[in-house]
């Protein structure tokens, strides 16, 4: 039972579909991408190997072109992000290898998601429809961080790095750019990647950002 008078410390994950409303992509393809992302999230939540995800997700809500998900534990947020990117990378590879598609069709059907993760204090608030949402500057920070990413990366706040830097499932790279977002929200930004992708990311630089 959620208490509206209590403060909670959570990990906040925002998944954002890149170029979701691009005028260069037909509307039916845009909707197809949104549906594929929904199926991807649903599959991770309900897969036989990761069924415990259902218990680890505190809250989930659609943002229109992505999802906002709250986790109790930081490692669960990182694992979920890795699974999302694995699933969509496999999807993109299948599209790329289908000889029936032109390069233009491949480009339009390729699904890229950017991911932002923050952590900190939030408080439950009642929405106009009666549902409970969570509010706090650290919640907003996750949305700001995901707007900073480009090209399908997982970016984290400095607090996530401090809490999770010893995790065994991946590595953090300091992008060496202290950012100041709207409403004076500030954080260093860290790239997080799966250890299996070390060769791809070990020489990454800050130019992956906007």
Language-model region placement:
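Catalytic/regulatory signature loops of cyclic-dinucleotide turnover enzymes
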Residues: 137-159
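Intrinsically disordered, glycine/charged-rich C-terminal tails and inter-domain linkers
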Residues: 1-2, 151-210
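Residues immediately flanking
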Residues: 15-17, 109, 119, 158
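Amphipathic alpha-helical segments in well-structured domains
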Residues: 34-38, 81, 135-142, 172
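A generic structural signal for short hydrophobic patches within well-formed alpha-helices
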Residues: 20, 77, 122, 160-161
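Catalytic NTP-binding/metal-coordinating core of nucleotidyl cyclase/transferase enzymes
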Residues: 1-83, 87
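Catalytic core of nucleotidyl cyclases, primarily class III adenylyl/guanylyl cyclases
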Residues: 49-76, 93-137
């Amino acid at each position: 039972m959620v208490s509206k008078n209590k403060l909670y410390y959570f990990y906040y994950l925002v998944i954002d579909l890149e170029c979701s409303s691009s005028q260069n992509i037909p509307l039916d393809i845009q909707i197809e991408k949104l549906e594929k992302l929904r199926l991807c999230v649903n599959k991770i939540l309900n897969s036989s190997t990761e069924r415990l995800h259902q218990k680890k997700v505190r809250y989930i809500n659609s943002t229109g072109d992505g999802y906002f998900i709250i986790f109790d534990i930081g490692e669960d947020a990182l694992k979920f992000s890795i699974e999302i990117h694995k699933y969509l990378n496999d999807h993109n590879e299948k599209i790329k290898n289908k000889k029936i598609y032109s390069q233009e069709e491949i480009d339009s059907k390729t699904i890229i998601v950017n991911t932002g993760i923050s952590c900190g204090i939030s408080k439950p608030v009642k929405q106009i429809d009666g549902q409970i949402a969570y509010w706090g500057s650290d919640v907003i920070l996750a949305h700001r961080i995901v707007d900073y990413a480009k090209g399908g990366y997982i970016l984290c706040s400095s607090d996530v790095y401090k809490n999770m830097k010893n995790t065994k499932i991946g590595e953090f790279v300091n992008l060496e750019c202290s950012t100041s977002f709207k409403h004076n929200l500030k954080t260093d930004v860290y790239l997080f990647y799966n250890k299996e992708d070390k060769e791809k990311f070990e020489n990454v630089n800050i130019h992956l950002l906007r």
